[in-house]
A protein has these predicted regions:
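Active-site cofactor/cluster-binding pocket
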Residues: 2-218
Length: 218
């Protein structure tokens, strides 16, 4: 049948416990977190459309925190497995055991699209930070919040790959919060893309560029 089309087979994301344990090098039953009195619990929400690297950005933050021995949770929420669907994840970093991975009060919101910015901005704590893609346009709030519009896509394109805009935002995050070292983000990127050395180099360059942009513009 010339008109018959086989169904498209899409790759299925694996967020099983076994898969995540492998990513984070976690041994079940072993409490690898440690108490650090200088760390206050930090709640981060990363949000955008499917295909913008929202979940991988959250995983990178989580891996960086895990590598430093901190308590961390990563909680994904996503629509259909296709580009354009809504996607967000919550990351909590703490100096003690985390009771719930659900984030209702956000310290730092990273938004890659307008719907996410509008949806989650109301949940950002007073004194918190909103970091978003400047291509979204103007955004105003009556709350006492630090709002930063960052040209993350432009930064990514300058390094040859617009899809690394999420990494530019992570670079900004590494400067805005001193909870994690920049080197930990870099090492997490190396772990995430261990089989793709060219991708590693580009992402680390974009990470550094994002951090530099924040230094010069905040």
């Amino acid at each position: 049948d010339l008109y018959r089309k086989d169904p498209i087979e899409r790759p299925v994301s694996d967020f099983s416990t076994e898969s995540l344990d492998k990513i984070f090098n976690v041994n079940r039953g072993e409490d690898s977190g440690y108490a650090d009195d200088d760390i206050k619990p930090l709640s981060i929400k990363v949000s955008g459309f499917g295909g913008q690297g929202v979940l991988s950005a959250g995983l990178t933050i989580s891996q960086a925190a895990c590598a430093e021995g901190k308590h961390v949770s990563w909680y994904p929420s996503y629509g259909p497995e296709q580009r354009g669907g809504k996607s967000n994840c919550s990351v909590v970093i703490s100096n003690e055991t985390i009771g719930t991975p659900v984030v209702d009060d956000i310290d730092i919101l990273i938004a890659l699209n307008k719907p996410s910015l509008e949806q989650f901005s109301k949940d950002v704590k007073v004194g918190g930070t909103i970091l978003y893609d400047s291509k979204i346009g103007e955004f105003e709030t009556d709350k006492d919040i630090n709002v930063i519009a960052m040209p993350c896509v432009d930064i990514a394109e300058e390094h040859g790959n617009a899809r690394t805009a999420n990494t530019a935002l992570l670079g900004a995050l590494s400067e805005l919060s001193n909870v994690l070292k920049r080197e930990s983000y870099e090492n997490a990127i190396r772990e995430m893309f261990v089989s793709k050395p060219k991708v590693i180099d580009v992402n680390i360059a974009v990470l550094k560029a994002g951090a530099e942009w924040i230094k010069n513009n905040s």
